[in-house]
């Protein structure tokens, strides 16, 4: 779920608050359209698409689905998720959090004008 995703981000990117990712580019945060502005925004587009795939699983609601995972020294592991939805959503969030850690953060792409840059 989104709370766990926030915690995963704090695991892989401990030196930057999770809310820096909540309104970044065209895809990080609510909704998403246009072309990603950079590598970090592409991480978010991929995460959005992953959630869309998760929603195709019967009764799977990725924004609120809880799952089990471990964070150890910046390494994330999804664990003990017997149900398909939990395992899928955990992996969506894990892959995105790792992607965030590897992508440059460009301050100019925070809080962009969606109408101007995301058509």
UniProtKB/Swiss-Prot annotation:
Class of the enzyme per the UniProt entry, highest EC level: hydrolase
Catalysis performed (reactions): a 1,2-diacyl-sn-glycero-3-phosphocholine + H2O = a 1-acyl-sn-glycero-3-phosphocholine + a fatty acid + H(+)
Pfam families: Phospholip_A2_1
Subcellular location: Secreted
GO cellular component, one term: extracellular region
Listed SUPFAM superfamilies: Phospholipase A2, PLA2
Cofactor binding notes: Binds 1 Ca(2+) ion.
Disulfide bonds: 11-71, 26-118, 28-44, 43-99, 50-92, 60-85, 78-90
Any one biological process term the GO annotation gives: phospholipid metabolic process
Active site: 47, 93
Tissue: Expressed by the venom gland.
Superkingdom field: Eukaryota
Function of the protein: PLA2 catalyzes the calcium-dependent hydrolysis of the 2-acyl groups in 3-sn-phosphoglycerides.
Family: Belongs to the phospholipase A2 family. Group I subfamily. D49 sub-subfamily.
Protein name per UniProt: Acidic phospholipase A2 CM-II
């Amino acid at each position: 779920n989104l709370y766990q995703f926030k915690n995963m981000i704090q695991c892989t990117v401990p030196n930057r608050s999770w809310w820096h990712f909540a309104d970044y580019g065209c895809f990080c945060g609510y909704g998403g359209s246009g072309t990603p502005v950079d590598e970090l925004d592409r991480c978010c587009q991929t995460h959005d698409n992953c959630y869309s795939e998760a929603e195709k699983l019967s009764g799977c609601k990725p924004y609120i689905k809880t799952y089990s995972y471990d964070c150890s020294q910046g390494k994330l592991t999804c664990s003990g998720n017997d149900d398909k939805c939990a395992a899928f959503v955990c992996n969506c969030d894990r892959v995105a959090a790792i992607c965030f850690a590897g992508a440059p953060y460009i301050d100019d792409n925070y809080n962009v004008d969606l109408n101007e840059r995301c058509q």
